């Protein structure tokens, strides 16, 4: 085995499991309102029904901002409406969001390139720094794990110094389930018991065999081409297969593909599993896989397009095999693409959008999804329930009869349903204090599971003072992280610093540390940048 092959394999292993440069502050923006009061702004967040800790964090941050003479108001609203404002309309000042530790996010691509490159799919805050653009591109083509790690570490240091965003805390996945009804739950980094591996492995000890799974946000859509939200991915992966999966240990394992062979830095050979069928009985073929790649590239599938743009050619090489030629090496390909991408049935999607009455595939509701995954779609009562049943013909059939996703109006309502046995488990997070309470009840387990996600205060850097790195740094320095960690999160968190969490050990830059809340130092940073205060204590723009 050559040294290069060993390094490449080491890279794949490291990518599947889990060098700081000196930087200069970005140039001071030219303020149109020199020596005028800094205008009030708003912090947008999901309401308490979806996640009660976010508005609580927001209230503490708005109060803390008074210490630097700045007025902020809190806008807590429906989760899906807020997501739309940020990710479609870019109509926001600041935004508190929880970046969940989805399996594909073990790879640093999401938190480095997709969120911070000027053309990144998740860069809705308008950030554009040539140092980060360059590092984001370099880490994508660095096929040796240690070389890529150094680039990712350097990017984390720059992002922290530039305070492009403020990771607030690294929370545990706080979940609860009825252990007197469910067996064999499989927790996973970043997903807790809401993992795909729990979905297919959990057993039901009594009742009809269906697992009532609680969630506090309504499902937005079942379109695998348009999906960007974590909640959508968690439901779609039950219905649609992927070529590979990230297992509970963080290792990439074959799924719909029996093998994915990295021939060289720009060549990938894939062999599709024999005998797979779509839920309507048609055979799954390698032509479906090739169609899925081409189709999602044509329609600019938002989550997948950055990888698909690197696909120079996709060629069928046998009855069940294909070869991908890349235009350049693409390090995130395995975990960020193959472990996330949904295979589509060509015989259905080839006529969409024309026969669906929409002008764009991304607007297609897909209200009767047909996939090849371990669960078959039964019904979707929008805003209330989604029901899927076990696909007993699947190569990895579920051990339960199916899953019913129930939308509850609040965390309290979901916790009450678990307490009385009407709900079997949480899919996503439950308020930490409620987890502690449920853990005291016989037959219920409430616990926090390790995660590489984080709560984040994001800044729209196109707007007013948020364009100024010094101002953002001062904001980062007033966040009362200790109080948020100990009181709001009930201890189920660590203070936030870098955009890659400590739980993601290989990629986390441990030299990037959380800023301690200190209003005086924040004011000193502002003063050094030229900000002043009027007689009423209100913050004024620099000259």
Where are these regions (language model features)?
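Short, well-ordered beta-strand elements
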Residues: 37-49, 72-73, 207-218, 267-270, ...
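Detector for C-terminal structural segments
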Residues: 11-38, 45, 52-63, 85-218, ...
């Amino acid at each position: 085995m050559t040294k290069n092959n060993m390094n490449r394999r080491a890279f794949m292993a490291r990518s599947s499991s889990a060098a700081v440069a000196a930087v200069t502050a970005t140039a001071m923006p030219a303020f149109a309102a020199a020596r005028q009061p800094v205008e009030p702004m708003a912090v947008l967040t999901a309401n308490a029904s979806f996640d009660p800790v976010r508005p609580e964090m927001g209230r503490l941050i708005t109060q803390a901002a008074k210490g630097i003479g700045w007025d902020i108001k809190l806008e807590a609203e429906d989760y899906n409406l807020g997501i739309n404002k940020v990710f479609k309309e870019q109509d926001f000042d600041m935004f508190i969001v929880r970046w969940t530790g989805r399996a594909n996010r073990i790879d640093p691509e999401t938190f480095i390139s997709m969120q911070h490159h000027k053309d990144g799919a998740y860069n809705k805050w308008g950030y554009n720094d040539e140092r980060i653009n360059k590092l984001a591109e370099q880490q994508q083509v660095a096929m040796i794990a240690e070389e890529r790690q150094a680039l990712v570490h350097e990017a984390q240091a720059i992002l922290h110094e530039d305070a492009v965003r403020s990771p607030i805390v690294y929370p545990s996945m706080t979940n609860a389930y009825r252990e007197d009804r469910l067996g064999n739950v499989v927790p996973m980094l970043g997903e807790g018991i809401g993992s795909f591996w729990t979905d297919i492995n959990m057993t039901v000890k009594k009742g009809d065999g269906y697992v009532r799974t609680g969630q506090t946000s309504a499902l937005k859509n079942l379109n695998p081409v348009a999906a960007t939200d974590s909640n959508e991915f968690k439901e779609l992966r039950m219905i649609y297969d992927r070529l590979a999966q990230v297992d509970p240990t963080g290792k990439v394992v074959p799924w719909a593909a029996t093998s994915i062979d990295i021939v060289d830095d720009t060549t990938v050979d894939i062999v599709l599993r024999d005998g797979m069928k779509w839920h309507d009985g048609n055979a799954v073929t390698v032509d479906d896989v090739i169609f899925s790649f081409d189709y999602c590239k044509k329609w600019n599938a938002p989550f997948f397009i950055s990888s698909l743009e690197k696909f120079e050619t996709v060629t069928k090489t046998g009855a069940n095999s294909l070869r991908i030629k890349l235009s350049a090496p693409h390090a995130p390909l395995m975990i960020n693409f193959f472990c996330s991408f949904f295979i589509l049935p060509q015989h259905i999607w080839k006529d969409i959008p024309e026969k669906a009455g929409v002008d764009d595939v991304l607007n297609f509701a897909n209200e009767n999804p047909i996939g090849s995954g371990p669960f078959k779609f039964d019904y979707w009562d929008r805003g209330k329930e989604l029901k899927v049943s076990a696909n007993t013909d699947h190569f990895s059939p579920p051990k339960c009869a199916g899953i019913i996703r129930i939308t509850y109006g609040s965390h309290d309502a979901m916790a009450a349903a678990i307490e009385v046995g009407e709900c079997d488990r949480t899919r996503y997070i439950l308020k930490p204090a409620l987890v502690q309470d449920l853990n005291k009840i016989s037959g219920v387990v409430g616990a926090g599971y390790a995660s590489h996600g984080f709560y984040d205060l994001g800044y729209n850097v196109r707007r007013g003072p948020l364009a100024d790195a010094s101002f953002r740094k001062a904001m980062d320095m007033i966040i009362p992280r200790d109080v948020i960690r100990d009181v709001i999160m009930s201890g189920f968190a660590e203070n936030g610093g870098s955009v890659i969490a400590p739980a993601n050990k290989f990629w986390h830059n441990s030299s990037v540390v959380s800023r301690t809340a200190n209003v005086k130092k924040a004011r000193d940073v502002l003063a050094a940048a030229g900000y002043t205060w009027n007689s009423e204590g209100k913050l004024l723009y620099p000259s």
